[in-house]
Amino acid sequence: MPRVEVGLVIHSRMHARAPVDVWRSVRSLPDFWRLLQVRVASQFGDGLFQAGLAGALLFNPDRAADPMAIAGAFAVLFLPYSLLGPFAGALMDRWDRRWVLVGANTGRLALIAGVGTILAVGAGDVPLLVGALVANGLARFVASGLSAALPHVVPREQVVTMNSVAIASGAVSAFLGANFMLLPRWLLGSGDEGASAIVFLVAIPVSIALLWSLRFGPRVLGPDDTERAIHGSAVYAVVTGWLHGARTVVQLPTVAAGLSGLAAHRMVVGINSLLILLLVRHVTARAVGGLGTALLFFAATGLGAFLANVLTPTAIRRWGRYATANGALAAAATIQVAAAGLLVPVMVVCGFLLGVAGQVVKLCADSAMQMDVDDALRGHVFAVQDALFWVSYILSITVAAALIPEHGHAPVFVLFGSAIYLAGLVVHTIVGRRGQPVIGR
């Protein structure tokens, strides 16, 4: 056999073995395997809850929403926790993270029961949004705790790969949860009663996540009591949560650069989300067609993110975090321009490609925080990331809602999104250059 053909055969066999090797690596890390199971169950519940809530608020014949109402709903859901998240992060860096996961999931169960009851009795939007606000805040708390705990159950040289595995598994689970919502909605209707049943179903995966969180031993998930740990009372640690988290980000250019790129991406996601929701709300069968089209767009974005989870570890090993994130931001700016025609099929394709680019940026930021931040401060920094994640989203969606017409035809905002990506690229390039060389960069 010619040498070239032999090389191709060997190369193809290596690629065929890659998923098997990753699976063996996962199963060889028992605590990571348990953590992955908690993530999968938790994010299935997240996807089901968020899709059910979106259907109840935006595609519900018993309720109606204009652009500002949509933006207001997102703000009430995410902004308060985003501002308080870094304070909660202080607790993740002081308390056994196993008990943080247990406590947060217990609180989620109580809130799920409350939100389901509010929908069942047909109460107004305010109590519904307040209940959903707290439930979603606890879900984000769980997500931050899982990310902060990962370096404790994975060897340093495998952090990037296993983080991609964890995020990919969680994304698939959330996608399945969101789409599972369509079954009870189809069976029970698109009104408040059907939405209530969907929310009550969320208790099943959250209960599983709660029980699986109990399998970890004391302090297996951290935090470590290193020399950089914040001592003093828990009240002091909570009150200074924002300060310690923000200061750590500023002191580490690799982390600051990653978060700047992530913030730019989330701003564009906010604009695109509002545009697609407004466009599909004018589909004739609003309760079915409009929601189905919106789910198709978000599913395409999620599929792109899943693909990024597969590609990013290889890209980082070949080009490093800095160059990989820069390339993703540059590609995103170009892809965004292609959606300016506001044709829904084109927007779905662009959503897929932006899902790839945006998730690459996020994974680069995640690896910087997991590898460059002291464990005693990692919870603070992940909470800051979570805050930035949602503040950027809400800020852009609120500004856009004040200016975009109700029918959603505003191509200039798509082009503005491309400019935001370019701004994020510039900031990431300048700030990232100041970072000292570290392993995995």
UniProtKB/Swiss-Prot annotation:
Keywords: Cell membrane, Membrane, Transmembrane, Transmembrane helix, Transport. It is found in: Cell membrane. InterPro entries: MFS, MFS_trans_sf. Coiled coil: none annotated. The keyword Aminoacyl-tRNA synthetase does not apply. It is a multi-pass membrane protein. The chain crosses the membrane at residues 68-88, 110-130, 131-151, 164-184, 194-214, 229-246, 260-280, 287-307, 337-357, 384-404, 412-432. GO terms for biological process: response to antibiotic. The keyword NAD does not apply. Belongs to the major facilitator superfamily. One of its GO terms (cellular component) is plasma membrane. GO terms for molecular function: efflux transmembrane transporter activity. This is Uncharacterized MFS-type transporter Rv0037c. It holds the Pfam family MFS_1.
